[in-house]
Structure formats: C-alpha cells, structure tokens
Amino acid sequence: MLTGVTDGIFCCLLGTPPNAVGPLESVESSDGYTFVEVKPGRVLRVKHAGPAPAAAPPPPSSASSDAAQGDLSGLVRCQRRITVYRNGRLLVENLGRAPRADLLHGQNGSGEPPAALEVELADPAGSDGRLAPGSAGSGSGSGSGGRRRRARRPKRTIHIDCEKRITSCKGAQADVVLFFIHGVGGSLAIWKEQLDFFVRLGYEVVAPDLAGHGASSAPQVAAAYTFYALAEDMRAIFKRYAKKRNVLIGHSYGVSFCTFLAHEYPDLVHKVIMINGGGPTALEPSFCSIFNMPTCVLHCLSPCLAWSFLKAGFARQGAKEKQLLKEGNAFNVSSFVLRAMMSGQYWPEGDEVYHAELTVPVLLVHGMHDKFVPVEEDQRMAEILLLAFLKLIDEGSHMVMLECPETVNTLLHEFLLWEPEPSPKALPEPLPAPPEDKK
C-alpha cells in the first residue's frame, strides 16, 4: 500500500510544472492516513482523526458574573530568574507562586517548588549535574571562600515575567489539538490505545511517523536523521495542524521534539506531556555506543537488539509483551536508520537553561521499571521546569503506554482537564460592591 501511495506522490511531483513552488500538500490514503510531504521527496505518514464537525455552539450570554469570573480562570503569573555563572553553575530562582496544587489522585510529585535551585550544568564530557536547593551562596566545593566568590561571576541572567492562561482542554472544544510524537524505533502505532481513547472523547489528534519509521519515507542519507532535520519535520506537521490550544505528548526521544516546539511556539503550546523522556540535558551522541558499528554488523545483531529492547523496555517479557512489541512496530526500523538516528542525537541548545525557560505546564510520566531512563532523570526534569508534575507508574516500564494504557489514558485526560487556581498577582482589583437600596 505504501509503495503505491509513494509512487503516486512522486508521479504527481514529476507532473508539476517546472516553475511550481513549494512541496506537495498531502495525499489521502484509503485506510485513513495522510501522507504529507514536508520537503521535496520527504514524506511522512500522519494519523489525523477527530470527531465529526458539529453545529456551532450558541453565543455566550451577555453580562454575566459567571462569565466575568470565567475570564480569570486559569490565569497565573510566571516569574523566574535564571543566572548562569562562569564556573558552570546555574541558579534558578522562583520569584512567584507556581500552581503546584495536587493535580492527580495519588500525586507523586512534590507540593511546592523550592524558592531557589542551584544546578551544576551537565559536563559535555559525561559527568552528571547535581541539584541542590538553596540560595546563591549555598553549596560546598574545593578551594577557599575567596576563590569561590571570584568564580561566581554571572555570565548571563534571564528574567521571566509573564502571565499565562492555563485552561481545561475538553474534547468538545474545537480549538484543542493533541499531538503525539514517538521515539527511536517506534511508530504512530504505539499510540493506538491513546488515539482511540481521545477520539472517542471528542478530541482532535495528530500522530506522525518520524522519517524512516512506520510508513514514512526513509532517505538513505544519514543527515536526514539528525535532531535538527527531524525537528523541522515536526515543525512542519505542527504548523499544518495546530490550532489555538495545542497539547504535545512525547515518548522518549519524542520528548525532545515536544520541548523544541514548546520553546519555539510558547503562545500556541498549551500543555506538554513527557513520557519517560529523561533529564533536562543537551543531547550528544555517544562515541562508544554499539550503534556506531557498521550497518552490516547491526543488521546481523538485529535479533539480539530486538530481544534486548524487549527485556529493557517492558516490565514483563511474556507473550503479551511480544505481541505488543510486534503490533506497535516498536524497535522495527532498518539498521541504517537506527544507526543514523542514534548518531544524529546532537542538540547542544537543549540544556538545563533551555528547559528552565519553559513556562508551559508539563506532566511527567515515568514507568518505574524503565531500564533506559532512570527515575532520577525525570525527577531532575521536574525540579528544573517551572510548572511540572511527576507521576510514577509502578507497573510500567519504558513502553508504559503499551503496558498500562488505561492508567496512562487516565493520567493524560486528568492533566488535560486540569486548570489551576489564579495566582493573587494575576487577579485584578475587585470591583466595589454596588450600594444597597434603602427601603
């Protein structure tokens, strides 16, 4: 089926006039998928589904105290100062009150963020950064106090002071779109349970296959699988389907693209959900990885790699998990694409400062049996982000959306419906009460 659709796309391309500008918009397939050409010759399969168009809702009633109060719902003030020091440390100061009230039943995350958070930026050589709540002068290190004070010269300071309206995203609302982005080796099929669930609730959903994955085209050039190339693909898909309030849901490597889009389009991204995405560190490929072996060697090792993924990606390794792995097209890519994807994970901008600048509310979901992403990394992400909630799933692993679909669907839906209480600084002065009529 894919070959026929792709051939049709290329025939259309060859049949266009020489002076045609811009790529082909899209081709609809008979099985409900859309093939979008994000660049000439670069075609992504996209699952775009939603409820049938309904009649326009009646206009809201005019003067109403409830409507006036509704205009203030979800309005919060985001205030934060980020200071980067020359000695490689980062100080994050939360100047306002972040809406960290209980989000979910059995919430695992902490209640209130620390007033200040001091971070040692991750060393590109591989040393892990450490988090230490405290003031600018806290922390112990080698050297005398004078040397420490001289080393703590600010390199740059970033001030964040804005108001955001964080509202409940319901399925019946036409301005809400959910974007699902998978990780390395997956496809949009890993989101089947989530896509079906949210479409039944009336949400509009968009789920692309990354290049080289699923039914998308697979260029035989390693440069086609760098982070920046894939991020531009996701930008094109986002700009095509985005509406007023967009929610990004990413898994593993897909979380990095969600972060990128949230940073690029802060006014369009309403909420973000990160599933087993790891810590807030810049991406850099490992030169000692097994994926740096020649493609022919990786091809011979593919059965072993698939078995290793089953062992590390699922809490259990029974017949059910093997079937989920097969049906979800997880870890089902060519050796060339797998090698190029792993070696192309270079994103130096995506460090702690980049994540600390985000003002969008984030739900972090972590499967406790995950052997790819330690829970400490997601905990570190929750501490860096301004508005973050961490939820741990005891029965899940790296592929938690396949293992525990009901639990994941419930968490995601509750987060979509969540709406914070407005902070005092975001509220206007109350209007004076009208004088009472004297009888």
Curated annotation (Swiss-Prot):
Q: Where is this region: Disordered?
A: 49-70, 124-156
Highest taxon listed in the record's lineage: Eukaryota
Instruction: Say where the protein is mainly found.
Output: cytoplasm
- Show where the AB hydrolase-1 domain sits: 177-279
Stretches of Basic residues bias are at 146-156
Q: Name one GO biological process term.
A: negative regulation of NLRP3 inflammasome complex assembly
Q: Got any disulfides in this one, which pairs?
A: none
The places in or outside the cell where this protein is found are: Cytoplasm
Q: Which GO terms describe its cellular component?
A: cytoplasm; extracellular exosome; mitochondrion
Sorted alphabetically, the keyword list is:
Cytoplasm, Hydrolase, Inflammatory response
Question: EC number(s) for this protein?
Answer: 3.-.-.-
The molecular function terms of the Gene Ontology recorded here are: carboxylic ester hydrolase activity; lysophosphatidic acid acyltransferase activity
Active-site residue numbers: 252, 370, 398
Q: Where is the composition biased (Gly residues)?
A: 136-145
Q: What does this protein do?
A: Negatively regulates NLRP3-driven inflammation. Promotes NLRP3 degradation through the chaperone-mediated autophagy (CMA) pathway, hence attenuating inflammasome activation and IL1B secretion. Acts by recruiting palmitoyltransferase ZDHHC12 to NLRP3, facilitating NLRP3 palmitoylation and subsequent degradation.
Question: Which PANTHER family did the record assign?
Answer: PROTEIN ABHD8 (PTHR42886:SF83), RE40534P-RELATED (PTHR42886)
* Protein family: Belongs to the AB hydrolase superfamily.
Q: How does it assemble?
A: Interacts with NLRP3 (via NACHT and LLR domains); this interaction is enhanced in the presence of NLRP3 inflammasome inducers, such as ATP, nigericin, silica, or alum. Interacts with ZDHHC12. (Microbial infection) Interacts with SARS-CoV-2 nucleoprotein N; this interaction disrupts the NLRP3-ABHD8 association, enhancing NLRP3 stability, ultimately leading to increased inflammasome activation.
The protein depicted here goes by the name Protein ABHD8
Designated gene of the protein: ABHD8
